[in-house]
Each structure stands twice: as structure tokens, then as C-alpha cells.
Amino acid sequence: MLERFSKSYRIINKEKFVEKLINFSVDQDYFILLNSNNNSDKYDLLCGYGVKSFIKSSENSLKKLDNFFELKKDWLFGYMAYDLKNEIEVLNDDNIDFINMPNLYFFQPEIVWFVKGKIVTGLSFEKDLIDNDWKKFNEISKKEKTKNSSIVKLNLRNSKSEYINKVNKIKERIFRGDCYEMNFCFDLFSEYDEINPYDTYVKLNNYTKSPMSSFLKVN
């Protein structure tokens, strides 16, 4: 495994730095930002972009990922989709897949940035790339490349009565002792509207301050 060069810098405002990173991502094919916001964690923020290598799979995915990691032994960013469960257990669900994403997608970034407190550290196989990209970040002005999204009308996939019925079934299972906690996700969609994902992420993150905020762009 090749070692990465590292260099650290100081920032004044993390939120402004996040906006610069999101603006920078417009010109990147592979980009991920993981933001802890104000929650205590090992890193306040992790970011990776560019691609040295990648893996995507919808069959025997975990074994392929394990082999990929053993080969690279480096930073890998990506996701495991909900339907990966169907590779582990014999499961059949009738959920409609409107996105058709692979069950697993990970990439090895050309450069990694992490933030802890007021210190930003860059990691790269090319020493000059860290300084060059840092200069690019500081040349980016707010909303330089991203534009505001138009107002989008969101629709629920299920009716209110269907939603209440599912919540009641979840409560029954909790009362029965099948589980003590359950995440219930539901679909909000818009069929014909276009949004600016960069501007939308910044606005949503500033509003929610989610402890597991993420922005991912692949290919």
C-alpha cells in the first residue's frame, strides 16, 4: 500500500468550509462528504473525492468488498444499499425500485480531507495536490457554482391511512417484544421537478444539523 502525504491547515468557520467543498464537488465525478455537525465524534467532517479505483456489485457483494479492501488497504468511501439484505438472507420484498442503484458501491479517493476542531488535514498520494486543492477551496465564493433550487412539490407514496396502519403494526410488534426500537422510512417523491442537489444539501444540513449528514456523488 502506498502511503499518503498529509498537510494541515486552520479554518475559522466549518460551515463556510462545507459550502466551499460542496461547490468544489460540482466538477467532481466521485465525491463524498460525511458531516457530524456539532456532535462529538472522531472527526467533525470527512471528505473524499477523485477516484483511484472503485467497486460496485449486486451479487456476492460483501465478499467482493472484502477482497477489494484487502487489495487496497486504504481509505474507501461508499454505501451499502437496503437491498443488500437479499444477498445475505433469502428474502423477497415487493418494494418498487425507482433508482436501480447497485447493492454496494465503494471507491478509493485520490484525496481525503478531515476536520477536527479548527484543523483541516489533507491526505493524498501526490503532495502538491493537497496545496493546489486548498488554494482552489479558498478561491471559491459562496454559491459561485451552485444556484438556488426551485420549490418542489413532494408527494407521499402511501396515503395517510396506510401510514397510520403501518405505525400501529410497528407499535404492536414493540409491545409484543419482537424488538424495542424500529426505524420506519417512508417515501417522499416528485416526478417531474428538478432540484439542485448541491444547494439542497447545504440548506437541509443547515436546517437539520443531522449527526450523520452525508452527500455522495458517484459517476
Task: List PLM regions with ranges.
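Extended alpha-helical targeting/anchoring segments
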Residues: 1-219
